[in-house]
């Protein structure tokens, strides 16, 4: 299981409410529309992958 520090992701986006919106949108893109993850999957769920992408600065608030 992945260890995600949500605080790091919040700092990248600005606040926790926007983080939820951005992460859920990205997870939806991967799950429904078949977009490729920008990080290794490591058997994680799409929401965890989205949070890892945000934490690494690969996804930004639009």
UniProtKB/Swiss-Prot annotation:
Catalysed reaction, written as an equation = RNA(n) + a ribonucleoside 5'-triphosphate = RNA(n+1) + diphosphate
Q: Which GO terms describe its biological process?
A: DNA-templated transcription
- Name recorded for this polypeptide: DNA-directed RNA polymerase subunit omega
Q: GO molecular function of the protein, one example?
A: DNA-directed RNA polymerase activity
Q: Would you tell me the Gene Ontology cellular component terms?
A: DNA-directed RNA polymerase complex
Gene name tied to this protein: rpoZ
Look up the coiled coil feature and give its residue ranges: none
Homology family: Belongs to the RNA polymerase subunit omega family.
Q: Which NCBIfam families match?
A: rpoZ
What species was this sequence derived from? Wigglesworthia glossinidia brevipalpis
């Amino acid at each position: 299981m992945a260890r995600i520090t949500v605080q790091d992701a919040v700092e990248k986006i600005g606040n926790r409410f926007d983080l939820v919106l951005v992460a859920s949108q990205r997870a939806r893109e991967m799950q429904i529309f078949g977009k490729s993850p920008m990080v290794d999957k490591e058997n994680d769920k799409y929401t965890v992958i989205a949070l890892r992408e945000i934490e690494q600065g690969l996804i930004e608030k639009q």
